[in-house]
Structure formats: structure tokens, C-alpha cells
């Protein structure tokens, strides 16, 4: 990936622990290093509406800590030192990520999306669609490859 540069000083990568978010974070580390950008990772703990936003959700909090620890390992493997990783609590991930991009004045949000095929076409989920439509900065998608068909 040498020679690829992104015109951004501050990059936000939402992570959720799936393969797509790990792959896109690794790619974002390479982009940030090439572009000399600051990289921010965010994990959103979605709190159900029937619970107070401050509710202790141990399992989700533990999962977030594990995911962010993995993100820091990836950053170290990619020799990127300037990485800020944190978790947020919100009702819905999409608006929380857009607010994070606004509040921290991000130049780009890079999203990893898994390959999904419904009704004959590739689709985005509600979080990705919300970010695409509402983020105040560039939005870049990295989608997994389609699975290789198994030949019988």
C-alpha cells in the first residue's frame, strides 16, 4: 500500500470486534502512517432505551475493553504510536459516531462493513447508512470481499 495518502489529519475508525472492523483498522493505521494523521478508534456501547444511559452493562463494557485492547495491539503491530482508542455509551451507534466526528473535528471516518447480500444486492446496515448521510467529513467504506464460491 505504499504511496497511498489520505488528505486528512484526523481519522476516526468505529470498531465493533468483527473481522471487517479489524481489517479496516489495520488499513487505517497504514493510511495514517503514510499521511501522518492522528488515528482515533471508537467502540460504542449501545444502551437499550428501557435502561438509563449510565447503566452498568458489564458484558458490553468488558467486550468493549477487549476490542479496544485488540485495536491497540494492531496499532503496535503496524508501528503506529499516535492512536486514541475509547468507548462511548449511546442509544444508537450511528448518531454517537457522527457526534464524535463533529466534536473531535475529524477529517474522515473510515468504516469497515461486512459483505452482506440481500435480495440480490449488497446492502449497508442502519449505522453505516446513518454515518454516510450525516457525518460532517469524508466517509470511506472498506467492504470485505464476497466469499469465494465453493466448487463441487
Residue ranges of predicted features:
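Structural beta-alpha unit
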Residues: 1-6, 76-109, 129, 146-152
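Short, well-ordered secondary-structure micro-motifs
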Residues: 24, 51-54, 95-98, 121-122, ...
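Conserved hydrophobic residues forming the short capping helix/wall of the S-adenosyl-L-methionine
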Residues: 32, 71-75, 101
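A short acidic, glycine-rich active-site loop
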Residues: 56-67
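Glycine-rich, Arg-bearing micro-motifs that act as flexible, cationic patches
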Residues: 108-134, 148-151
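Short, flexible loop segments at boundaries between secondary-structure elements
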Residues: 137-149
Amino acid at each position: 500500500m505504499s504511496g497511498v495518502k489520505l488528505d486528512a489529519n484526523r481519522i476516526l475508525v468505529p470498531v465493533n470486534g468483527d473481522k471487517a472492523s479489524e481489517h479496516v483498522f489495520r488499513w487505517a493505521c497504514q493510511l495514517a502512517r503514510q499521511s501522518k494523521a492522528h488515528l482515533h478508534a471508537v467502540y460504542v456501547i449501545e444502551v437499550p432505551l428501557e435502561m438509563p444511559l449510565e447503566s452498568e452493562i458489564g458484558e458490553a463494557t468488558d467486550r468493549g475493553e477487549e476490542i479496544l485492547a485488540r485495536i491497540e495491539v494492531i496499532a503496535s503491530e503496524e508501528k503506529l504510536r499516535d492512536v486514541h482508542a475509547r468507548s462511548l455509551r449511546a442509544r444508537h451507534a450511528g448518531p454517537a459516531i457522527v457526534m464524535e466526528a463533529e466534536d473531535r473535528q475529524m477529517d474522515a471516518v473510515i468504516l469497515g462493513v461486512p459483505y452482506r447480500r440481500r435480495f440480490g444486492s449488497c446492502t449497508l446496515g442502519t449505522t453505516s447508512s446513518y454515518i454516510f448521510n450525516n457525518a460532517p467529513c469524508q466517509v470511506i467504506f472498506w467492504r470485505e470481499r464476497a466469499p469465494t464460491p465453493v466448487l463441487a
